[in-house]
């Protein structure tokens, strides 16, 4: 049983367990007659609720059918979010002969059979046995799988720059068995796995939810990508075991292997870093960048030394959203007042501004609801992540103006930013004479690192954007945790609301020290004790700063909240088949109810 005391200082001693009221999104502007049926789930349009012909053009993603228009706009929006929020491109990786080499055990040569004993032993972390269901499924096939040298380092480093997909011509059971070896926690690929079950013929980026201008492919076979060669980085084929036509001895029989430092994956990683650097070199030009052009001017971008490539000007297909006319378009996605779909001018009153994501973005009310739905679905299924909204002041840190320090606190001015203090900093805005001291709450860095494994995180503060930016340069300088998901009083000057968070409320947890700033979302809220390090106005007791003490690292507010967040996450994802019916609000009430019962007992 999970136990965490005093997580919510405002919790009532007895509380009835009740289900939160869940508001279904409504779309009053559209009827079956004027709806484009962009988002269809199991044969029903999500927007107008009518039955839709299954033959409508588009793509299916685990029961969710996107029309051609919806697919084009979703790809464009995901790429914008990825580039501007996370500074990530998309990377599509082949499996066989690119990341690994597998062979059926009966096909091993006599000279290779020693590997059967070595597979999975303490001496070999790169060689594994696996059993895969065959066709028919009553047949089980045993394979040996050899990981390509440098694979673990490659995935770890590439993950910092790219959202990654696996795309294989193998079966889904085979791909899942491989991924249990190379990505058991689904940190790198989530559920972004495309197999011959979904794509039985040639490979295509139509299956990848991102604009082609932001997608790089790494594959050992050029002809598998007839329509996307300009996105392709060829990698030298990795053959570890003996193949039927091979004359020379393979690595397996020679007991050697490809070079770790100068092999295929190491060379491709250097290239990917160059592409990423060039793409994001000028932040103002990111929206006009195209990896296909970037790749064509990066020297030696093929890892095959004999490959020669001419500079390719990619053919960029206009989105099929151009089929929409201004009269039939719902104006769902707007940029600087211009509808992305029909290119007509749209009034600001027709949607909500999301400038914090990227300047000029406006979404209609229908687009907000559907984007939230789609984001939550992708986050839950692909990454096994929920969304977490964090307050700054008195939750993650405490900031005070330097002139407000008491006499007994002034020693801190010298300590701030020194080698002895990595939790205390001076901050000062450009052009502002006022100087501040910011004290990070104990356990903050560990909290962010661990929470990032389970949640996509936002900062939501009543401070200014300038202030938030300065604080985030201290706690997240590389934008690993929050990206640009930062909401301030500039966007939300009154009460705080989840309307600005692009995720369904059923998958969002809020951590804040002030309950009354969330009038409409208390059921999503985890109260955290207020962190006050410096002396407050009117405070009688001595603060931590004057006592030269601090909140407990292991038993303080953030440590306790992290335990609760892990419990919520564990319960949410406990049964994968029930994900779409799970709701963090019910889980928070359930946990709180259990804690109340325990405290009474």
Curated annotation (Swiss-Prot):
Tissue-level expression: Expressed in roots, seedlings, hypocotyls, cotyledons, leaves, siliques and flowers.
Catalytic activity: O-phospho-L-seryl-[protein] + H2O = L-seryl-[protein] + phosphate; O-phospho-L-threonyl-[protein] + H2O = L-threonyl-[protein] + phosphate
Record has Cell inner membrane as a keyword: no
A Pfam match: NIF
Location relative to the cell: Nucleus
Keyword set, alphabetical order: Abscisic acid signaling pathway, Activator, Hydrolase, Nucleus, Stress response, Transcription, Transcription regulation
Region (Disordered): 1-20
Triggers of expression: Induced transiently by abscisic acid (ABA), salt (NaCl), cold and drought.
Compositional bias ranges of the Basic and acidic residues kind: 8-20
One Gene Ontology term, aspect cellular component: nucleus
GO biological process: abscisic acid-activated signaling pathway; response to abscisic acid; response to cold; response to salt; response to water deprivation
The protein's Enzyme Commission number: 3.1.3.16
MF terms (GO), sorted A to Z: RNA polymerase II CTD heptapeptide repeat phosphatase activity
Biological role: Mediates the dephosphorylation of 'Ser-2' of the heptad repeats YSPTSPS in the C-terminal domain of the largest RNA polymerase II subunit (RPB1). This promotes the activity of RNA polymerase II. Positively regulates abscisic acid (ABA) and drought responses, including the regulation of specific genes expression.
Protein name as it appears in the record: RNA polymerase II C-terminal domain phosphatase-like 5
Native source organism of the sequence: Arabidopsis thaliana
Lineage start: Eukaryota, Viridiplantae, Streptophyta, Embryophyta, Tracheophyta
